[in-house]
């Protein structure tokens, strides 16, 4: 990489660290190209990204961001997984690490909070924002459905009473 390319890469990575909902740092030593491509495609499908960066450039890119506390994690062969949703990157990384022992989670960051490996693991167990929105919407809709049923019940009962009277009059 030439100096201009490095500068551009650091600027791009700095924007990533500033804009991401969460960042996960992991070792990938010994992982095959096929495994890394599979990992990248799973992360992309979930709405995240995986990058491999030189540790020195990643540390420079971290300066001036909320995630600056994770700069000590960049030792050895490290990768960066990030997403706008705070739950997506940790969830995909932890799911992939369960089936692949070559991916070792070192830690991460969510906003100003620096996470160790256990913190990333516990963050991965939380439901995503979309799942939480769906649950909240379901909780909001349930009472409305019940209220509509209660309001409509007297009218339907009244209609049944009129229908019964009409049938009684016809029979008589």
From Swiss-Prot:
GO molecular function annotation: large ribosomal subunit rRNA binding
Domain of life where this protein originates: Bacteria
Keywords (A to Z) from UniProt: Ribonucleoprotein, Ribosomal protein, RNA-binding, rRNA-binding
GO biological process terms on file: translation
Keyword set includes Lyase: no
Cysteines engaged in disulfide bonds, as pairs: none
Keyword presence, Phosphoprotein: no
Annotated Pfam families: Ribosomal_L10
GO annotation, cellular component aspect: ribonucleoprotein complex; ribosome
Subunit structure: Part of the ribosomal stalk of the 50S ribosomal subunit. The N-terminus interacts with L11 and the large rRNA to form the base of the stalk. The C-terminus forms an elongated spine to which L12 dimers bind in a sequential fashion forming a multimeric L10(L12)X complex.
Stated role: Forms part of the ribosomal stalk, playing a central role in the interaction of the ribosome with GTP-bound translation factors.
Family: Belongs to the universal ribosomal protein uL10 family.
Protein name (record): Large ribosomal subunit protein uL10
Originating organism: Rhizobium etli (strain ATCC 51251 / DSM 11541 / JCM 21823 / NBRC 15573 / CFN 42)
């Amino acid at each position: 990489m030439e100096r201009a390319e490095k500068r551009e890469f650091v600027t791009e990575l700095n924007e990533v660290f500033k804009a991401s909902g969460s960042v996960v740092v992991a070792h990938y030593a010994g992982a095959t190209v096929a495994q890394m491509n599979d990992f990248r495609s799973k992360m992309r499908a979930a709405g995240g990204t995986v990058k491999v960066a030189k540790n020195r450039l990643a540390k420079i890119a971290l300066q001036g961001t909320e995630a600056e506390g994770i700069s000590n994690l960049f030792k050895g062969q490290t990768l960066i997984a990030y997403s706008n949703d705070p739950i997506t990157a940790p969830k995909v990384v932890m799911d992939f690490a369960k089936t692949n022992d070559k991916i070792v989670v070192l830690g991460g960051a969510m906003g100003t909070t620096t996470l160790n490996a256990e913190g990333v693991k516990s963050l991965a167990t939380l439901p995503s924002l979309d799942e939480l929105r769906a649950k909240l919407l379901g909780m909001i809709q349930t009472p409305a459905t019940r209220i509509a049923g209660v309001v409509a019940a007297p009218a339907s009962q009244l209609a049944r009473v009129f229908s019964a009277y009409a049938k009684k009059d016809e029979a008589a």
